[in-house]
């Protein structure tokens, strides 16, 4: 017999622990496991637990159609809402499936199933089967991870800067640093490909340190030219758990004789939620240095309003998904206008990213938005272009 290994990631598990606590998470897993075991107690199916948020199945049988039907049954079973402490917990699950001729190399087959499951999760697909195409993609990723080490060691990384315009003074007061990778053979590697890879390894710490140091070096160079620009840079969830991060930032500021106002740090809501307690501790330590911290991509996370009270952010960046259709969407206008008013009352400065036309910019100015960012103001540009853009001191000359 052939075997099919099915690995399921229970994405909603993190929401359970955030809302109801760790004990509720265990209760949720227990109920879900019992439901599955009762429903799929068959001679050809073994059900067990994988990693913390995973359930695994070993199914004997050749027929692909039969396996597809079974997977759909499992999906329907797991998608049913679970009620805990009177709260309905919606289910979100991702399936990875691998085929095995035998279980003699079970570990490698589970690795294949996990690769498929991770792809399903990343691409927001419900079910992914491991095949030759996915195998090749995995090989490419492995090579990129190897090359990433060389990129850091051999100066293949560089920064572009996207200007951020004060909508009050109409002056460029800050920029966002965006890391890029110029591979010697493959050309420019998109950040949405190599950053997620780096975040899965310790390389993200090396990249973040490189960016912090380079930003401090650049800020010092601009100061000598009379440009007093704050540089915003992004931190990942792994960075927030780095107990040497804050000391490194402080050392870089001191080395380049910069004040804390030279840097600003941006953290996505989802990154902060990976380890809420650790994130809050790190953010408070960063703020103690005098550096402002922004919540990035606001409006796309889970239970956003409660997080504004929990996390000690200074700045709120409204996600571009609300801004790009601002002119044509009355709903987006209502959300953005009320968010600006509410968050100003809470003491936040507001940044709108994704501004692509004059009408959206004017609406944001009318509503009192503090800072704007987007291609209408400027695309990401080099440090030399920033000098010209900023010294021109009026939007449209960049």
Please name every model-derived segment.
Residues 1-5, 11-37, 48-52, 56, ...:
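Conserved long alpha-helical elements within nucleotide-processing catalytic cores of c-di-GMP signaling
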Residues 106, 110, 115-158, 168, ...:
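C-di-GMP signaling machinery
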Residues 58-67, 85-88, 92-109, 133-136, ...:
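Catalytic strand-loop-helix junctions within cyclic-nucleotide turnover domains
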Residues 33-64, 291-295, 348, 358:
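Conserved helix-loop-beta segment at the catalytic/binding core of cyclic-nucleotide signaling proteins
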Residues 103, 167-176, 201-279, 354:
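Catalytic core of bacterial c-di-GMP phosphodiesterases, primarily the EAL and HD-GYP domains
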Residues 140-197, 234, 295, 352, ...:
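Active-site core of bacterial EAL-family cyclic-dinucleotide phosphodiesterase domains
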Residues 4, 49-58, 77, 83-118, ...:
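A short glycine-enriched loop-to-beta-strand structural element that forms part of the catalytic core
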Residues 184-185, 236-243, 262-277, 289-398:
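EAL-family c-di-GMP phosphodiesterase catalytic domain
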């Amino acid at each position: 017999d052939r075997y099919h290994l099915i690995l399921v990631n229970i994405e909603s598990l993190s929401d359970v622990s955030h809302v109801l606590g760790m004990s509720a998470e265990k209760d949720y897993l227990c109920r879900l496991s019992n439901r599955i075991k009762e429903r799929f107690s068959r001679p050809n199916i073994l059900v067990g637990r994988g990693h913390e948020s995973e359930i695994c199945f070993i199914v004997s049988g050749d027929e692909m159609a039969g396996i597809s039907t079974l997977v759909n049954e499992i999906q329907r079973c797991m998608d049913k809402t679970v009620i805990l402490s009177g709260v309905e917990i919606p289910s979100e699950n991702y399936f990875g499936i691998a085929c095995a001729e035998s279980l003699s190399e079970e570990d490698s087959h589970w690795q294949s199933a996990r690769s498929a499951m991770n792809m399903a999760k990343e691409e927001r697909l419900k079910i992914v089967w491991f095949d030759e195409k996915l195998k090749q993609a995995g090989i490419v990723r492995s090579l990129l991870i190897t090359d990433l080490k060389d990129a850091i060691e051999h100066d293949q990384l560089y920064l572009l800067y996207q200007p951020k315009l004060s909508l009050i003074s109409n002056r460029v007061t800050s920029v966002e640093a965006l890391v890029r990778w110029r591979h010697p053979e493959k050309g420019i590697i998109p950040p949405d490909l190599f950053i997620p890879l780096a975040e899965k390894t310790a390389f993200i710490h090396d990249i973040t340190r490189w960016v912090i140091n380079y930003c401090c070096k650049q800020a010092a160079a601009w100061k000598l030219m009379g440009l007093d620009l704050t540089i915003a840079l992004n931190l990942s969830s792994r960075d927030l758990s780095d107990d040497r991060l804050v000391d490194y930032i402080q050392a870089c500021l001191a080395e380049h004789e910069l004040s804390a106002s030279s840097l600003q740090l941006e953290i996505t809501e989802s990154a902060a939620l990976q380890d809420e307690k650790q994130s809050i501790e790190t953010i408070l330590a960063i703020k103690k240095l005098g550096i402002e911290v922004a919540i990035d991509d606001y409006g796309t996370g889970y239970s956003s309003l409660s997080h504004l009270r929990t996390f000690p952010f200074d700045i709120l960046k409204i996600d571009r998904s609300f801004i790009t259709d601002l002119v044509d969407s009355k709903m987006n206008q209502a959300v953005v206008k009320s968010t600006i008013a509410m968050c100003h009352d809470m003491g936040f400065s507001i940044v709108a990213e994704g501004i692509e036309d004059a009408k959206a910019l004017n609406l944001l100015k009318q509503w009192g938005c503090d800072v704007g960012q987007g291609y209408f103001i400027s695309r990401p540009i080099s440090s030399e272009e920033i000098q010209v853009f900023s010294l021109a001191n009026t939007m449209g000359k960049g």
